[in-house]
Amino acid sequence: MGHYKANVRDLEFNLFEVFGRQEILGKGIYADLDVEAAKDILGEVARLAENELAASLVDSDRNPPIYDPVTCSVTIPESFKKSYQAYLDGEWGRLDTPVELGGMAVPPSLRWSIAEMVCGANPAIHMYGATFSFAKLLWHMGTEDQKKLAKHIVDNAWHTTTVSYTHLTLPTSDLV
């Protein structure tokens, strides 16, 4: 076990005993998500955060991305690639993706509970996972061309990022 231990009981207490999320789950826009499914999501993200995501924290912290100006490429630790791929394989970013783009209607309070675990385990994974949040922003506020880009971002888990150099941009998919 790594450095991170998710406090699922605290998250469930806040979601269901303080904020009463059981009153909205299984109904209306959240009809496809009941309390049991929400708790299952919390449990699975906790397992992922404590294991696969936390596993690369120290290595990726001690070995930051390195830009090679000759090849215009960025190198990141293999352990980080493996952690991020585990996040992508679980399709956890789709919980913050519009339904129209293949996402799932999830209350913001549940999304923030998930974000707490991912960020606690490995903040860089949380930032890379923001790819899907950026797509959501483009989908809701963008032009028609930007909405096409949002779909591309979600379909390919891709976006352009700047890594320490204001003139450098490349697809995140090239890093993984």
What are these regions (language model features)?
Residues T97-E100, A130, Y165:
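An acidic- and aromatic-residue-enriched active-site/binding cleft used to recognize and process polar
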